[in-house]
A protein has these predicted regions:
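Residues at helix-coil transition
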Residues: 74-77, 108
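Hydrophobic residues within beta-strands of alpha/beta enzymes
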Residues: 45, 81, 111-113
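N-terminal beta1-alpha1-beta2 module of alpha/beta enzyme domains
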Residues: 1-75
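Conserved catalytic cysteine-centered active-site region
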Residues: 76-84
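Glycine-rich "substrate-gating" loop/helix at the edge of Rossmann-like oxidoreductase active sites
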Residues: 57-60, 86-91
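Flexible, glycine-rich active-site loops centered on histidine and acidic residues
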Residues: 4-25, 88-145
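Short linear capping/connector segments at secondary-structure termini
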Residues: 50-53, 84-87, 128
Length: 145
């Protein structure tokens, strides 16, 4: 098997859209990157499953991963689409599976779905998720998988 390479699509998490003021224009820039990757030799495009910027939360736009993945899947035709990685703590396993299966159908089988235990405490608390210790989060992750 030959190596495969993917590219992260800017989505705001890493302060990579701050030079564009309008969120609609930010999304257009994301689509442009995705389409360029789709027309190149890249195997996949990726977005982060985060809600706030890093290293510090700001008021800048961060696009939600699953909604973005669904939209980019419809804007592209060949390239695989994935999240790096889905946070188990943000969605019950059954909701994660339902969402993933929907995006997989929308992409005609081009979804890469990853799952992790989560680490960004600020996001958990900001959205009302209980922040637990690592053993508890890992236990929930094992149960979900």
């Amino acid at each position: 098997m030959s190596p495969r390479f993917g590219v992260f699509v800017p989505q705001g998490w890493r302060m990579d859209l701050v030079e564009i003021a309008d969120p609609a224009d930010q999304f257009d820039a994301m689509v442009s990157v995705a389409k360029q990757a789709d027309q190149s030799a890249f195997d996949s495009i990726w977005v982060y499953d985060h809600f706030h910027t890093v290293p510090e939360p700001t008021h800048n736009t961060v696009f939600e991963a699953w909604t973005t993945s669904a939209a980019l899947a419809r804007e592209t035709s060949r390239i695989n689409v994935g999240q790096m990685v889905g946070c188990n703590g943000y969605r019950q396993p059954s909701l994660y599976a339902k969402t993933a299966s929907t995006v997989d159908a929308m992409s005609r089988g081009r979804l890469y779905a990853g799952l992790g235990a989560g680490w960004y405490e600020h996001e958990w608390k900001a959205y009302g998720y209980e922040w637990t210790d690592i053993p508890t989060r890992m236990g929930c992750f094992r149960e979900a998988v």
